[in-house]
Each structure stands twice: as structure tokens, then as C-alpha cells.
A protein has these predicted regions:
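Short, flexible helix-loop junctions that flank or precede catalytic/ligand sites
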Residues: 1-345
Length: 345
């Protein structure tokens, strides 16, 4: 069995992911659900060869040393894929996330119009959050593409691995891959401040040093995009502050209250008629929100977001209501993800 055939089948069926696991048939995820491909199970030796065929020597060495590895894999004329290879009890496994060759625009994504206002700023931290598979990378790529078409600046991305490939339009774009073009997010961010960027995208805010450097970059006149695996704006603020030791928390609250521009927490919903669409909680850093961050009153954020629709804010439930009203999402699907399930009875 050839990996290119499996990946072509994945793309042809509009799947978001291909899952390979020794001892089982390949499976694909379509509109959020896993489906088996109607082929025989792949045994351990064949699976190992299949997964290894997608790696270069450096990636194979990492896989053998660390027992898992992340990398990108390109099939010319088909798509790019973000790959995580790992070991499991039956042998080798791998997850291939499809990254389309064409970057979707904010219009393609039916993104709220406030997204353009959020990113049209001279400086500040913009966080796009949500669980794995919620479309964070796709949303960020659309935001970066919008800036690339409309701003004459320098965009620098730091990713692990590089997902969407951006061609320079109005902007100069440089994309750096961790372990290939730089040793770590930290090293790349430290260096970034000397590379004259206007916009910096940090693939993931994984640790205290990366968060610290991202906040500093946002404070010193850069637009900084970052992602976290948090499900709401309030949890995002808590997560950012909680990575710091106790004695630094007050200072970080102050820094974050000054530099934050917005938090977009998104989740993917099954669309009526097939496909998926994102629902968003959107928190804009208004003076009231900045005060709540500074004074450690995160619990009051939800009501501030609820009443902030006039400036483009939206709770998840408000976003779900709008998707239901527009006929994009069915009520039972909205109820499944809603905070107040009774509202979608």
C-alpha cells in the first residue's frame, strides 16, 4: 500500500485527517467523525515502512530517540500534511492533518467581520485558542493572508512544523520551522526582535519563556499572534498568567492588560448539508476587560463579553445562536457545544 494513494483518498473525500495504526485498517476523519477505509488491516512491519517513508533522516533519528515526532510532509499537486508519528502497543501509528495548498480567506471561512478590525492594529497580542482540531491554524492563516494582501510590512512565523505556506504579496514573509530553521520557539523569538518584523506568528505558546518573549514583543510595537489549547477567553487569561511563578503574576497581569488585543476561542461545528463551520467566543481588550485582567477578576469576563456585542464581542452561545439563525448549524448540534444547553432546546 502506497502512502500517496492513502493521502490522495483522504483529500478526495474531504477528510481533515488520515489515521494510521498498526494492526488496523487506515481511517479518515470527515466532518468530525472517524470512518474506516475499506482496505485490509496494515500489519506492524508494513506500517513502520509506510510511516518511515514520509520521514527524512533527521526525522527518523528524532523518532527513534524521542518515540514520537512532528513534521510536515508535502505531496506536490495534492496538499501538505502536518504529521505526528508515534509508537503504540501494536506498533507504529501516525496522524496526518490535511493542510490545503490554497489558503482560505476570512470570507471563505465566513468569519465575523470584527476579525478584520482585530488584526488591523499597529501592535498587540492576538490569541486564537481552542482544542486540537478546532481550526486554529486555518483561522490564523486566513488572518495572516489578509495582512499579507493589505499591509506593507514584514511577517515572521515560527512554527513546529510549518503548516500553511504563505507567498509574499504586499508583505515580506519569512517562515521558520523549529528544529529545522531554529532550535526552539524561544531562540527564534529572541532573534525575531532583531529581524525587524511588524507581525510575528508564534505557532504555540508552550512555556513560560515563550509567553514572556511574546508579551515583550507585543509591548514593544509588534503584532503577535499565538495559539493555546484553551476553550474560552477566561481560561486563556488564566493559562497565560498561571505559567508564571507567584512573584511574577502581578507584573504579568499588568503586561497582559496593556498588550492584549483580543482572544478568539473557537470550536468547529457540523454544518447543515455537510462540511464544518467555526463558532467563536470573541473577547476584545476594551478598557473594562483590561481592568478585569489587571485586577484578577477573570470570573467577571463572561458577562463583560455578553454585553459587549456593540464592539464585536460574542459569547460562544451568542455565536451558536447566530449560526442557527442563518441555517448553517442545526439546533441539536449547537446544543451539544453550548454553555447554556436550555437555550437550544
Amino acid at each position: 500500500m502506497d502512502i500517496t494513494e492513502l493521502l490522495a483518498f483522504t483529500v478526495k473525500n474531504n477528510a481533515s485527517d488520515l489515521h494510521l495504526s498498526a494492526g488496523l485498517p487506515p481511517m479518515i476523519r470527515v466532518d468530525g467523525d472517524i470512518h474506516r477505509i475499506n482496505v485490509p488491516a496494515i500489519e506492524a512491519k508494513e506500517m513502520s515502512d509506510l510511516v518511515y517513508s514520509t520521514m527524512n533522516d533527521h526525522q527518523r533519528r528524532d523518532f527513534e530517540a524521542e518515540l514520537e515526532v512532528d513534521f510536515s510532509y508535502n505531496v506536490p499537486g495534492l496538499a501538505r500534511f502536518r504529521v505526528n508519528a508515534y509508537h503504540q502497543d501494536r506498533g507504529t501509528g501516525a496522524a496526518f492533518r490535511v493542510i490545503p495548498n490554497e489558503i482560505w480567506t476570512l470570507e471563505d471561512l465566513q468569519a465575523p467581520t470584527v476579525f478584520r478590525d482585530i488584526i488591523d492594529v499597529p501592535r498587540g497580542l492576538i490569541l486564537v485558542t481552542g482544542p486540537t482540531g478546532s481550526g486554529k491554524s486555518t483561522t490564523l492563516a486566513a488572518m495572516v493572508d489578509h495582512l499579507n494582501k493589505n499591509v506593507a510590512g514584514h511577517i515572521l512565523t515560527i512554527e513546529d512544523p510549518i503548516e500553511f505556506v504563505h507567498n509574499s504579496k504586499k508583505c515580506l514573509i519569512n517562515q521558520r520551522e523549529v528544529k529545522k530553521d531554529t532550535l526552539s520557539f524561544n531562540a527564534a523569538l529572541r532573534s525575531a526582535l532583531r529581524e525587524d518584523p511588524d507581525i510575528i506568528l508564534v505557532g504555540e505558546l508552550r512555556d513560560v519563556e515563550t509567553v514572556r518573549l511574546a508579551l515583550t514583543a507585543a509591548e514593544t510595537g509588534h503584532v503577535v499572534f499565538g495559539t493555546l489549547h484553551t476553550s474560552s477567553a477566561a481560561k486563556t487569561i488564566d493559562r497565560v498568567i498561571d505559567v508564571f511563578p507567584g512573584e511574577e503574576k502581578e507584573m504579568v497581569r499588568s503586561m497582559l492588560s496593556e498588550s492584549l488585543r483580543a482572544v478568539v476561542a473557537q470550536t468547529l461545528m457540523k454544518k447543515v448539508g455537510g462540511g464544518r463551520v467555526a463558532a467563536h467566543e470573541i473577547m476584545i481588550a476594551t478598557p473594562a476587560i483590561r481592568n478585569l485582567i489587571r485586577e484578577d477578576k477573570v470570573a467577571q469576563m463572561y458577562s463583560a463579553i455578553q454585553t459587549g456585542q456593540n464592539v464585536g464581542m460574542s459569547t460562544l452561545d451568542q455565536s451558536l445562536s447566530e449560526l442557527v439563525r442563518r441555517g448553517l448549524v442545526a439546533k441539536p448540534e449547537a446544543r451539544r457545544k453550548a454553555v447554556d444547553k436550555k437555550a437550544f432546546a
